[in-house]
């Protein structure tokens, strides 16, 4: 078999079409037991899980549904590919004012609770936590990991975040706003040496960040692209035409809150 160009290899890996992964999925699938790495199918529990941990295939800190080998492989082969993904941003609203009313240790505990809740919900919907930044989180929903319905997963995760933070009711334990967008993005490893990181870059990521900045507490702004790709039922939802910082064209988005 001819050697794939790096970009084509990345594209196949990110979309779930890499032949080597298919072989690994069959091989690891013969070992018990679930849960498993969503990419290579390595078992994380049972006898197979013991073996995987011994050879450093255990769950990755990046996401407990990815194994360390898959993450290391991504870092070992720098590069990436442009594919369609869905991106979710979630930010704490009024964090400066909240911090002013609390001791530093109390605020740190509150943010740790938020990060934990965000990571769990994102993981439950097969997203990958790209990073925690200040008072927010960024998640990527990639076809090879989240499936072809990655947009629906991103929307469901955003709704789950409202629920887990109490923003589906009148008294959230921490106020958050979120944004979801779907589009083409460069996904892969960037940087040099030990500073190399797996991430997504491009207008899709930037647009999601700008949407999130305009979402009020308890709101999710979902771009029409994400809504269409995710099969969102927009009956009764408010539609906003937004001017996003740094973009020449307006962006239309649907508003979802805890009661919708």
Where are these regions (language model features)?
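Alpha-helical scaffold within the catalytic cores of cyclic-nucleotide enzymes
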Residues: 112-127, 144-178, 203-212
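Cytosolic regulatory/linker segments at or just downstream of nucleotide-handling modules
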Residues: 217-260
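A structural signal for short, well-ordered beta-strand segments
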Residues: 87, 137, 176-182
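Long C-terminal interaction/binding lobes of large macromolecular proteins
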Residues: 19, 29, 148, 240, ...
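Short beta-strand->loop micro-motif that forms the acidic, two-metal-ion catalytic signature
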Residues: 133-147
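N-terminal alpha-helical interaction blocks
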Residues: 1-23
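Juxtacatalytic helix/coil linker segments
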Residues: 21-129, 133
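Catalytic-core segments of nucleotide cyclases and related cyclic-nucleotide turnover enzymes
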Residues: 181, 187-212
């Amino acid at each position: 078999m001819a050697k794939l160009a790096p970009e084509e290899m990345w594209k196949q890996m990110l979309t779930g079409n890499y032949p080597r992964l298919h072989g690994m999925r069959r091989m690891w699938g013969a070992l018990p037991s679930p849960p498993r790495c969503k990419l290579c199918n390595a078992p994380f529990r049972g006898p197979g899980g013991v073996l995987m941990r011994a050879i450093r295939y255990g769950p990755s800190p990046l996401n407990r549904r990815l194994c360390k080998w898959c993450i290391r492989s991504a870092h070992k082969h720098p590069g990436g590919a442009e594919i369609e993904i869905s991106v979710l941003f979630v930010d704490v609203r009024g964090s400066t004012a909240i911090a002013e009313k609390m001791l530093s240790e109390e605020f740190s505990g509150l943010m740790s609770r938020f990060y934990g809740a965000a990571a769990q919900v994102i993981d439950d919907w097969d997203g990958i936590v790209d990073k925690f930044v200040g008072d927010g989180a960024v998640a990527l929903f990639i076809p090879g990991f989240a499936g072809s319905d990655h947009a629906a997963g991103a929307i469901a995760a955003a709704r789950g975040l409202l629920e887990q933070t109490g923003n589906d009711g009148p008294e959230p334990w921490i106020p958050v706003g979120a944004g979801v967008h779907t589009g083409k993005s460069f996904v892969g490893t960037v940087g040099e040496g030990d500073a190399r990181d797996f991430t997504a870059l491009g207008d899709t990521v930037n647009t999601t960040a700008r949407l999130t900045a305009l979402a009020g507490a308890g709101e999710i702004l979902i771009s029409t692209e994400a809504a269409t790709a995710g099969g969102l039922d927009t009956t009764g939802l408010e539609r906003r035409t937004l001017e996003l910082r740094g973009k020449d064209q307006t962006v239309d988005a649907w508003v979802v809150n805890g009661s919708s």
